[in-house]
Amino acid sequence: MQKIKEYIKKLEEGCDLSSEEAEAALEEVLSTAEDGEIETFLLALKAKGEKPQEIVGFVRGMKKAGNMIKPNTPFRIVDTCGTGGDGLNTINVSTAAAIVTAAAGVPVAKHGNRAATSMTGSSDVLEALGIKVDLSPEYVRKTIEKIGIGFMFAPVFHPAMKRVAGVRKKLGVRTVFNILGPLTNPAGAKGQVVGVFDKNLCEPIAYALAELGTEHALVVHGDGMDEITNTGETYVAELKNGKVSTYTLTPESLGMLRASPGDTKGGSPKENARDLLCIFKGQKGPKRDLIILNAAAALYVSGIVGSIRQAIPIAEDAIDSGKVMVKFNQFRTFTGEFYQIDKKQGFIPGKTALSPSRVSMLSPASGEQA
């Protein structure tokens, strides 16, 4: 029996949904609800404001409908992912930071998609760099296990999202789906740096991550940016040891130079790819500093250091020693090889249904360690 109308009425009356109700509502939205009902539901929720328990329910519903993987790694897996939607068109900070983090020895399961409001999304710049982004889930798992980094293309891992694409486009406003991406990491990353487009989302998302089992997370909003910024103050809600604390960071407090907003602007996928390659090869400047700050945050939530500041020299060394270029080349080579295998097996991103034999590979196979 459909309950979406009941949930809409409750939201319109200003009442919060329980996590169970939110999960059930999300399941209807992704399956049987009509477009008009989806539209009304999303707008009513937006008008009321999303609460942590509602976000938790939506995330659980998304994961239930998605393709999850369980990579076997020696250390805590981390993700660097932003909501996007800040409208600032900076370079691809979280994507570059993910590669730097992996080069420093921390396994990364990067969740991402194409550009929503900026010129260049994470998958756009990776493709411009020659990295195959639309691998099947089991080959993403293998990439993470073999080289310590994998990219999880949202349409492959969350195919049910196609169901709401038309409504979201028609609405043309931010909805709860804009904040679910960073929270629905298909590899179950336990360390996360989550950038958000609105400072007021930092604490609700941190509390939601606590409920979802994340071990250490930084939910950040920096000077209008969904990253830790080097152009001004960054507001942080940190989840650690089950508790959430809030504070403000500045570039100076982390030993970095302050930059001007124009110094970190991005461009087209090709332009951003060129910038990232120059940085990976050692070019210094504000864009490199921005990437280092966010990679240091990822290293911090991985548990290998006790603070972001302690991690900055590690991130710098990963670039200066050449480790980042080695990791980048591995990433490009492995994804290219696995893409060809996928192609031979008939995998079509977003279209090919996973057979039972392929689904069984989404977690370590028999004989492998869990």
UniProtKB/Swiss-Prot annotation:
<keyword id="KW-0808">Transferase</keyword>
<keyword id="KW-0057">Aromatic amino acid biosynthesis</keyword>
<protein>
    <recommendedName>
        <fullName>Anthranilate phosphoribosyltransferase</fullName>
        <ecNumber>2.4.2.18</ecNumber>
    </recommendedName>
</protein>
<feature type="binding site">
    <location>
        <position position="90"/>
    </location>
    <ligand>
        <name>5-phospho-alpha-D-ribose 1-diphosphate</name>
    </ligand>
</feature>
<dbReference type="InterPro" id="IPR005940">
    <property type="entry name" value="Anthranilate_Pribosyl_Tfrase"/>
</dbReference>
<feature type="binding site">
    <location>
        <position position="94"/>
    </location>
    <ligand>
        <name>Mg(2+) 1</name>
    </ligand>
</feature>
<feature type="binding site">
    <location>
        <position position="227"/>
    </location>
    <ligand>
        <name>Mg(2+) 1</name>
    </ligand>
</feature>
<dbReference type="Pfam" id="PF02885">
    <property type="entry name" value="Glycos_trans_3N"/>
</dbReference>
<dbReference type="InterPro" id="IPR017459">
    <property type="entry name" value="Glycosyl_Trfase_fam3_N_dom"/>
</dbReference>
<keyword id="KW-0328">Glycosyltransferase</keyword>
<comment type="similarity">
    <text>Belongs to the anthranilate phosphoribosyltransferase family.</text>
</comment>
<feature type="binding site">
    <location>
        <position position="82"/>
    </location>
    <ligand>
        <name>anthranilate 1</name>
    </ligand>
</feature>
<keyword id="KW-0822">Tryptophan biosynthesis</keyword>
<dbReference type="GO" id="GO:0005829">
    <property type="term" value="C:cytosol"/>
</dbReference>
<comment type="subunit">
    <text>Homodimer.</text>
</comment>
<feature type="binding site">
    <location>
        <begin position="110"/>
        <end position="118"/>
    </location>
    <ligand>
        <name>5-phospho-alpha-D-ribose 1-diphosphate</name>
    </ligand>
</feature>
<feature type="binding site">
    <location>
        <position position="113"/>
    </location>
    <ligand>
        <name>anthranilate 1</name>
    </ligand>
</feature>
<comment type="pathway">
    <text>Amino-acid biosynthesis; L-tryptophan biosynthesis; L-tryptophan from chorismate: step 2/5.</text>
</comment>
<dbReference type="InterPro" id="IPR036320">
    <property type="entry name" value="Glycosyl_Trfase_fam3_N_dom_sf"/>
</dbReference>
<feature type="binding site">
    <location>
        <position position="227"/>
    </location>
    <ligand>
        <name>Mg(2+) 2</name>
    </ligand>
</feature>
<keyword id="KW-0479">Metal-binding</keyword>
<feature type="binding site">
    <location>
        <position position="122"/>
    </location>
    <ligand>
        <name>5-phospho-alpha-D-ribose 1-diphosphate</name>
    </ligand>
</feature>
<dbReference type="GO" id="GO:0000287">
    <property type="term" value="F:magnesium ion binding"/>
</dbReference>
<dbReference type="GO" id="GO:0004048">
    <property type="term" value="F:anthranilate phosphoribosyltransferase activity"/>
</dbReference>
<dbReference type="InterPro" id="IPR035902">
    <property type="entry name" value="Nuc_phospho_transferase"/>
</dbReference>
<feature type="binding site">
    <location>
        <begin position="85"/>
        <end position="86"/>
    </location>
    <ligand>
        <name>5-phospho-alpha-D-ribose 1-diphosphate</name>
    </ligand>
</feature>
<dbReference type="InterPro" id="IPR000312">
    <property type="entry name" value="Glycosyl_Trfase_fam3"/>
</dbReference>
<comment type="function">
    <text>Catalyzes the transfer of the phosphoribosyl group of 5-phosphorylribose-1-pyrophosphate (PRPP) to anthranilate to yield N-(5'-phosphoribosyl)-anthranilate (PRA).</text>
</comment>
<feature type="binding site">
    <location>
        <position position="82"/>
    </location>
    <ligand>
        <name>5-phospho-alpha-D-ribose 1-diphosphate</name>
    </ligand>
</feature>
<dbReference type="GO" id="GO:0000162">
    <property type="term" value="P:L-tryptophan biosynthetic process"/>
</dbReference>
<keyword id="KW-0460">Magnesium</keyword>
<keyword id="KW-0028">Amino-acid biosynthesis</keyword>
<dbReference type="Pfam" id="PF00591">
    <property type="entry name" value="Glycos_transf_3"/>
</dbReference>
<feature type="binding site">
    <location>
        <position position="168"/>
    </location>
    <ligand>
        <name>anthranilate 2</name>
    </ligand>
</feature>
<feature type="binding site">
    <location>
        <begin position="92"/>
        <end position="95"/>
    </location>
    <ligand>
        <name>5-phospho-alpha-D-ribose 1-diphosphate</name>
    </ligand>
</feature>
<feature type="binding site">
    <location>
        <position position="226"/>
    </location>
    <ligand>
        <name>Mg(2+) 2</name>
    </ligand>
</feature>
